[in-house]
């Protein structure tokens, strides 16, 4: 089995991390998605912060019986530390809405929209947010040659952490006829824009700041580069002219608000080299909380340490009526 694919797990694993506290928080992480390992790493720091803040904490590595486990432990709040399928796509928020358990991060529609690249793109364009040109290619199209002019980007519709993303450059020995659609029957083929990778942390509707990612290895910001120390350098704050930096923050807040996000989010952009034009890539409603993650780094720059960041996220916990 490809470790970067969703796999079905019947039973959740439950571990009590702290037996007393002001409120009982279920920290749901791991799960069945391709981003399972990232979620588990994120949960390590989150669990320590929750205990430090004085909460009773139960860790749940989510399986298909998650509803049964939640009924058994009866938490006051669920901290949704999942990434990818079943957690980031709106499934867990939907369940928690039915169970009327307050939870962190965005709700059903916001999560589902942000997770699906076709629908989020339509939403962005409807709200006059600039994006790169793209087309949708179906496996059944049986395309035998490059669907667009090189260079271009192949993106699975519903994967995060750049899993399955490929950039096809002019000189690459790549035949589209051999592409096997490993993450579903559709992909987005997007115009490759050469430029500076910029990321913005947003918390409760307010942009905390922006950083630039400078690649030290690899040709683009892929899974390996994101989660391997020494593969990329983070320039925080992003070294931009004041007017451009402010525009970046305003655009991020606009995306957050139009998508009706909740709690933390991370907006991603490319600043085209030749024109200084901003192109939105996506908004991530379940940003990582690992030692190399961007939202905690920007929050620290804004004067919010990791423990206080987790406390601010907890304050936003709610369910949708």
From Swiss-Prot:
Residues at which ATP binds: 147-199
Catalytic activity: 2 D-alanine + ATP = D-alanyl-D-alanine + ADP + phosphate + H(+)
UniProt cross-references to Pfam families, sorted A to Z: Dala_Dala_lig_C, Dala_Dala_lig_N
Cofactor: binding comment: Binds 2 magnesium or manganese ions per subunit.
Disulfide bonds: none
GO cellular component, one term: cytoplasm
Function (record text): Cell wall formation.
Single GO MF annotation: metal ion binding
Chief location: cytoplasm
Name under which the protein is recorded: D-alanine--D-alanine ligase
Similarity annotation: Belongs to the D-alanine--D-alanine ligase family.
Binding-site residues for Mg(2+) 1, renumbered to this chain: 268, 282
EC class of the enzyme, as a word: ligase
Localization per record: Cytoplasm
Top-level taxon of origin: Bacteria
Signal peptide: none
Enzyme Commission number(s): 6.3.2.4
Coiled-coil region: none
A biological-process GO annotation: peptidoglycan biosynthetic process
The organism of origin for this protein: Rickettsia felis (strain ATCC VR-1525 / URRWXCal2)
């Amino acid at each position: 089995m490809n470790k970067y694919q969703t796999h079905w797990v019947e039973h959740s694993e439950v571990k009590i991390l702290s037996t007393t506290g002001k409120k009982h928080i279920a920290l749901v992480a791991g799960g069945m998605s391709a981003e399972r390992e990232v979620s588990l790493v994120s949960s390590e720091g989150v669990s320590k912060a929750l205990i430090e803040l004085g909460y009773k904490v139960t860790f749940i590595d989510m399986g298909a019986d998650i509803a049964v486990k939640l009924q058994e432990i009866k938490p006051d709040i669920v901290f949704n530390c999942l990434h990818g399928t079943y957690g980031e796509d709106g499934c867990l928020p939907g369940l928690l809405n039915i169970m009327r358990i307050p939870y962190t991060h965005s709700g059903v529609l916001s999560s589902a929209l942000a997770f699906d690249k076709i629908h989020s793109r339509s939403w962005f364009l409807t709200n006059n947010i600039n994006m790169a040109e793209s087309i949708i290619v179906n496996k059944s199209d049986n395309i035998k040659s490059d669907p667009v002019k090189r260079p271009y980007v192949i993106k699975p519709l519903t994967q995060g952490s750049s899993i399955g993303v490929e950039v096809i450059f002019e000189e690459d020995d790549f035949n589209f006829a051999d592409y096997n659609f490993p993450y579903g029957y559709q992909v987005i083929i997007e115009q490759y824009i050469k430029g500076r990778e910029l990321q913005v942390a947003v918390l409760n509707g307010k942009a905390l700041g922006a950083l630039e990612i400078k690649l030290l290895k690899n040709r683009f910001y892929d899974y390996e580069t994101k989660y391997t120390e020494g593969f990329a350098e983070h320039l925080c704050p992003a070294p931009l002219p004041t007017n451009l930096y402010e525009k970046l923050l305003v655009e991020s807040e606009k995306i957050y608000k139009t998508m009706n996000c909740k709690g933390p989010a991370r907006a991603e952009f490319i600043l085209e080299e030749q024109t200084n034009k901003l192109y939105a890539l996506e908004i991530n409603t379940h940003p990582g909380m690992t030692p190399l993650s961007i939202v905690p780094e920007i929050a620290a720059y804004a004067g919010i340490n990791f423990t206080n960041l987790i406390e601010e996220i907890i304050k936003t916990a709610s369910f949708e009526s």
